[in-house]
Amino acid sequence: MTMRMKKLFSILAVAATVLLTACDEHQDFPDTAMKVGHILCTDGKTMSYEDYQASGKQAIAVVFSINQREEMEGKGYAVYLWDIAPEAFADSIGVEQDTSCDLTAYDGNKNTFALYGTTDVKSPLAERVFDMWRYGQSAYIPSVAQMRLLYHAKDIIN
């Protein structure tokens, strides 16, 4: 055999091996990634609405944004489903509370800690938010940028 024939034979052998290789059985694996519109339950699990209905678990929030930016902390954002008493929003105390005024920062968590940690006066809203932590989620008052994300997702999550 000439060198050219050996090379051609090798190429044909590799091609035949690749073409004759097959899977035993195709398996579809379920998509378990968190998505916008998924339900966050009190045990910290997220699931599709259909799975939630069948689970018998208690919902606490709806996912409205998935973390795809470095400046966002956590895996994503979810909006709380239950109402907070209106008096918690009656906070016109006029005291500097070291919160950010940056309209583009995703710093709601930092701002909530600043409100909660103020020693001069207490923020009723921050106290109510910290009361929610019995479920293990890191609930906080959203920043302006986080509220914009929620606004843009309103048609998906409603």
Question: Each predicted region: which residue ranges?
Answer:
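N-terminal secretory signal peptides that target proteins for export/translocation
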Residues: 1-5
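Sec-dependent signal peptide recognition
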Residues: 6-13
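C-terminal motif of bacterial Sec signal peptides marking the signal peptidase cleavage site
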Residues: 19-22
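Extracellular adhesion/carbohydrate-recognition regions
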Residues: 26-139
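Beta-edge loop/turn motif
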Residues: 136-154
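Cytochrome P450 catalytic domain signature, combining two hallmark sequence patches
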Residues: 156-158
